[in-house]
């Protein structure tokens, strides 16, 4: 089973705000400066203050170079090594940041994202909701058909890990969440099973099934290229 490591991956820490909307609908944050063990990679927090509550949200972004995948994989697993856990259920969803780089302004670089809306149905989810977490080993997340399709159609496969119950759904917690809802992790990789070649191989980036002729000769009459 081939294994891919991320080309880039990083936590974007949102700015602490006096309102949920201000934290959740922000268009930028701050890239983490650590190189390992992101302590609150996926986070929603509502903290009581002397005068008012404050809110903060973190999201985690990952990119894999999938340019070498020319056939839709039979299956794929996103594996993340966990350390700590504080109940932040989440979804991996399709991200839209620029190839090869994650910037402060990518806090909302999520396909289908709309500020102020419940984005549960707007985004492209790459798996079912992740609701359990090992703090002493790899957490294997089975990716769905949308992810498999994008792995072959996109040269850069991009993911955002986003807390589901509040951040994605646009739901402010009723009670103060003093410790936040977050997960910590370090090592990430993508395992996939190569699909059947069939007639899906690409010739110079064009699907073979869409080519009628090669140098004037019908492909049906060509045994090999």
Model-based region annotation:
Residues 1-45:
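N-terminal leader/pro-regions and domain N-caps
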Residues 57-59, 73, 136, 154-156, ...:
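A general secondary-structure signal for short beta-strands and their flanking turns/coil
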Residues 61-65, 75-81, 140-144, 158-162, ...:
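Residues within well-ordered beta-strands of beta-sheet-rich folds
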Residues 26-84:
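A short beta-strand-loop element at or near the start of a globular domain
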Residues 193-225:
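Intrinsically disordered, compositionally biased repeat/linker segments
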Residues 6-8, 83-155:
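Beta-strand-rich interaction/scaffold domains
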Residues 2-15, 146, 150-197:
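Proprotein-processing/basic-patch segments
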């Amino acid at each position: 089973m081939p294994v891919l490591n991320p080309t880039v991956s990083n936590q974007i820490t949102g700015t602490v705000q006096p309102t949920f909307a201000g934290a959740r609908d922000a268009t930028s944050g701050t890239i983490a400066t650590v190189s390992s063990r992101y302590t609150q990679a996926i986070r929603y927090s509502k903290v009581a203050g002397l005068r008012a509550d404050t809110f903060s949200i973190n999201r985690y972004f990952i990119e894999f170079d999938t340019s070498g995948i020319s056939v839709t994989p039979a299956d794929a697993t996103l594996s993340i090594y966990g350390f700590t856990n504080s109940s932040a259920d989440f979804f991996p969803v399709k991200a839209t940041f620029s190839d090869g780089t994650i910037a402060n302004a990518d806090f909302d670089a999520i396909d289908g994202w709309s500020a102020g809306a419940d984005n549960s149905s707007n985004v492209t989810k790459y798996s079912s909701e992740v609701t359990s977490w090992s703090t002493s080993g790899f957490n294997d997340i089975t990716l769905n058909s949308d992810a498999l399709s994008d792995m072959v159609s996109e040269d850069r496969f991009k993911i955002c890990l986003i807390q589901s119950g509040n951040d994605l759904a646009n739901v402010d917690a009723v009670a103060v969440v003093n410790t936040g809802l977050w997960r910590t992790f370090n090592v990430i990789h993508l395992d996939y099973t190569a699909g059947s070649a069939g007639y899906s191989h690409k010739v110079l980036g064009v699907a073979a099934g869409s080519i009628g002729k090669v140098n004037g000769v019908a492909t049906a009459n060509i045994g090999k290229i």
